[in-house]
């Protein structure tokens, strides 16, 4: 299978490290022009350095609808197309699992803002561009937490990630008549950023061994494993697939 994105424009949120950086590198290697988006300017600078001139950076908070609209409008004005959107921005916003009675309204909302609202705002902004083209690919990055439960016990994270799956299915039916596919990748636990490194360390040796023992392939995934799944959904090989959720977790 030879996957290429020659001449295509790809927007990737959460591209300052981890999955997003791996995706940026993978798309650039296959001929795409990548617009790497994140709130972390320093991390974006490293992503663009690694990717080279085919990658540009844009600092934006995906939870800010007005900022998202302005950013996408500017990209659309200077690029001929926006072919692919990967909604990768997310995470737990520094939170840890706590009893439900200890969760504030802002704790709950903060996680929904970046994980679910951010995906909605980005899709909302690119949809008119893709409709005019008559073609597009949207790939949402959910989590195994959205399919089962969160390993961290963070209620908002599991709920927001499940919401991304629902959003994927709904948008697939809404946008399908315009030649736009919408699919979802649900990664298992991957040591991909400072937050997941802290979670890994907190498990201790026994917890780490137990986690790997629950995985059929008996290893943790890598950011490249997730990027490769995104490559498939974004490619012509997935042209008749939409509204689907692909678990990339080594077999759970």
Predicted regions and their residues:
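Alpha-helical segment proximal to the catalytic Tyr-Lys
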Residues: 128, 147, 173-174, 239
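C-terminal substrate-recognition "lid" of short-chain dehydrogenase/reductases
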Residues: 120-123, 135, 219-248
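Short, small/polar-rich loop/turn modules that mediate ligand/substrate recognition or access, typified
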Residues: 176, 181, 241-243
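Residue(s) in the substrate-gating loop at a strand-loop-helix junction
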Residues: 143
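A glycine/serine/threonine-rich, flexible loop-to-helix segment
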Residues: 177, 184, 189-215
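Active-site helix of classical SDR
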Residues: 123, 160, 168
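Substrate-binding pocket helix/loop in short-chain dehydrogenase/reductase
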Residues: 96-100, 104-112, 211
């Amino acid at each position: 299978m030879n996957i290429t994105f020659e001449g295509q424009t790809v927007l990737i949120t959460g591209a300052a490290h981890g999955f997003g950086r791996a995706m940026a590198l993978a798309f650039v290697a296959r001929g795409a022009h990548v617009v790497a988006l994140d709130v972390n300017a320093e991390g974006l600078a490293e992503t663009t350095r690694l990717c080279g001139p085919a990658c540009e950076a844009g600092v934006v908070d995906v939870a800010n609808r007005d900022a998202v609209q302005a950013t996408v409008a500017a990209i659309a004005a200077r690029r001929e197309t926006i072919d692919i959107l990967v909604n990768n921005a997310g995470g737990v916003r520094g939170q840890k699992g706590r009893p439900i009675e200890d969760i504030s309204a802002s704790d709950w909302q903060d996680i929904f803002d970046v994980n679910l609202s951010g995906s909605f705002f980005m899709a909302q902004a690119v949809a008119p561009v893709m409709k005019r083209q008559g073609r597009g690919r949207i790939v949402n990055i959910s989590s195994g937490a959205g399919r089962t439960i969160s390993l961290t016990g963070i209620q908002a994270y599991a709920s927001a990630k499940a919401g991304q799956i629902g959003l994927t299915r709904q948008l697939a039916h809404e946008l399908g008549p315009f030649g736009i596919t919408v699919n979802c990748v649900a990664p298992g636990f991957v040591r991909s950023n400072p937050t997941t490194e802290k979670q890994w360390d907190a498990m201790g040796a026994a917890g780490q061994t137990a986690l790997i023992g629950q995985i059929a392939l008996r290893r943790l995934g890598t950011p490249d494993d997730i990027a490769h799944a995104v490559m498939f959904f974004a490619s012509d090989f997935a042209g008749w697939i939409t509204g689907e959720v692909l678990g990339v977790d080594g077999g759970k």
